[in-house]
Amino acid sequence: MSFHQVEEWFEIFRQFGYLPGFILLYIRAIIPVFPLALYILINIQAYGPILGILISWLGLISGTFTVYLICKRLVNTERMQRIKQRTAVQRLISFIDRQGLIPLFILLCFPFTPNTLINFVASLSHIRPKYYFIVLASSKLVSTIILGYLGKEITTILTHPLRGILMLVVLVVFWIVGKKLEQHFMGSKKE
């Protein structure tokens, strides 16, 4: 696939307006198959940095909050009760209930934390939906801006190799910090 073909795909994407970019991130929040940075990069390339980040953020928080509300609705089902009994989930619920919303905000700010698990746990905790939405919206704005900036910089790797190296270092640091936070809050993986 050539650069010209990629540009044609972005042009087709743009012709459908902002809805495809929104739907792309909405579905990605519900079914996290590919890296979030990839979807944000697609939106930035299609709509520009500011609109791309805004559309990505709106799609991401809409999809993530939808998952949260579905889980909240199903909290008393047998399957959710079994999930709630897991040690890692109990530990995270207890931590969120004790410490409040700030640790949740910090966890959700990092692009490489398991958002699906955090959604499940938040729906099982005693956090009210409106407070979770505020934390979700603000933390995902931070996360989307970070990923959007890093994604925007991907196009300059060839012209400015030092920026590419710096971007790679920042991504690795985010990944390591996210994994450390995940281990700290969720305990061992031997469950």
Curated annotation (Swiss-Prot):
Sorted alphabetically, the Gene Ontology cellular component annotations on this record are:
plasma membrane
Coiled-coil residue windows: none
Phenotypic consequence of gene deletion:
Deletion of the gene does not affect amphomycin minimum inhibitory concentrations. The triple mutant lacking uptA, popT and SAOUHSC_00901 is not viable.
Top-level taxon in the UniProt lineage: Bacteria
Does the keyword field hold Thylakoid?
no
Membrane topology is: Multi-pass membrane protein
Cell compartments where the protein resides: Cell membrane
What job does the chain carry out? May catalyze the transport of undecaprenyl phosphate (UndP) across the cytoplasmic membrane, from the external side to the cytoplasmic side.
Q: Which family does it belong to?
A: Belongs to the TVP38/TMEM64 family.
**What is this protein called in UniProt?**
Putative undecaprenyl phosphate transporter SAOUHSC_00901
